[in-house]
Amino acid sequence: MDFNYNSNHLEGNTLTYGQTEILLLFGKVIGEADVRDVQEMTASNVGLRMMSEEASVKEVPLTQNFIRTLHKTLLREDYTVYRELPGGVQTSYVIHAGQYKTRPNSVITRYGDRIEYASPEETPSLMTDLVDWYNKAEQEGKLSPVELAALFH
């Protein structure tokens, strides 16, 4: 309950703790609530259960397919992002649920520096490397689950 509420609240979800509790325990919404917030909280709960179930089966290694399925569960559906480029030019692109990115992405820090992330072309092989590293590290058992999760994240 706490994880779902806090995680979604950090992302801007407006459901109160009480609304979250009633939604996740009884599948009902009390008071006024944004439909998207309800859908996001519900999807988050399903995703958390998926991860818990997957983690409970130690013999099953992490796979890229599971990561993409989890992504599709959390996003629920494809959606369009609208952006304004320098000079006021409008652009848009589609984020595909359950698929690796199809276009470059970056962030601009509060100091104005741009940080570029892996290109769409690099992403599949980098994900292979990440999943292979994770499975090897988990099998070796040298890291605690918290350390492993923190490094993976």
Identify the function of each model-found stretch.
Residues 1-153:
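FIC/Doc superfamily catalytic core
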